[in-house]
């Protein structure tokens, strides 16, 4: 799972002002994202049959590139189209209920603070998304930025759980994020609003891979 989190692209139709979401996602897939989440929220978000139809089209794209297709906070849609997994927040469906309904799917959980981490039923989730790293405008209900604090604190007590950092992340922050213990980064605007999506995605993937190699070298020296 940790390798799958290297470059996690989160996107919905409201995040794509320059191009159609299908074009954006396919370019990101071509350039090296390792996981995709369909997060369809906001005042102009698709609903009902339109949302289902879009999810199916995005799912087909992801299958073509062998990238897992995750849906945000809509377990019914996950079940309906047999998506690869579900991502939920602290105030969404309880994770134990999600696992009961999706025994063989990927389940991710958002965590912001150590208090949330300690109260979460982590035995039934496949990864946690920690953030927001920086202040972000992509989520109207975003919590205060936590930087690397929570990631570092979690890594000190849990070396095994897969962690992806999210929230206002650009390539400039990748090294510090990976160094703090995250296995990858999740981004919205860094890809969806980029002038050149392929170039931006490749740069992010390059920075993640480089940071992971450097962290491993540092770990080997310490050993």
Curated annotation (Swiss-Prot):
Its cofactor is Mg(2+). 4-amino-2-methyl-5-(diphosphooxymethyl)pyrimidine binds at residues 37-41, 72, 110, 139. Its EC number is 2.5.1.3. Keywords: Magnesium, Metal-binding, Thiamine biosynthesis, Transferase. Pfam families: TMP-TENI. GO terms for molecular function: magnesium ion binding; thiamine-phosphate diphosphorylase activity. Binds 1 Mg(2+) ion per subunit. One of its GO terms (cellular component) is cytoplasm. GO terms for biological process: thiamine biosynthetic process; thiamine diphosphate biosynthetic process. Mg(2+) binds at residues 73, 92. It catalyses: 2-[(2R,5Z)-2-carboxy-4-methylthiazol-5(2H)-ylidene]ethyl phosphate + 4-amino-2-methyl-5-(diphosphooxymethyl)pyrimidine + 2 H(+) = thiamine phosphate + CO2 + diphosphate; 2-(2-carboxy-4-methylthiazol-5-yl)ethyl phosphate + 4-amino-2-methyl-5-(diphosphooxymethyl)pyrimidine + 2 H(+) = thiamine phosphate + CO2 + diphosphate; 4-methyl-5-(2-phosphooxyethyl)-thiazole + 4-amino-2-methyl-5-(diphosphooxymethyl)pyrimidine + H(+) = thiamine phosphate + diphosphate. Condenses 4-methyl-5-(beta-hydroxyethyl)thiazole monophosphate (THZ-P) and 2-methyl-4-amino-5-hydroxymethyl pyrimidine pyrophosphate (HMP-PP) to form thiamine monophosphate (TMP). NCBIfam families: thiE. Belongs to the thiamine-phosphate synthase family. This is Thiamine-phosphate synthase. The lineage of its organism: Bacteria, Bacillati, Bacillota, Bacilli, Lactobacillales.
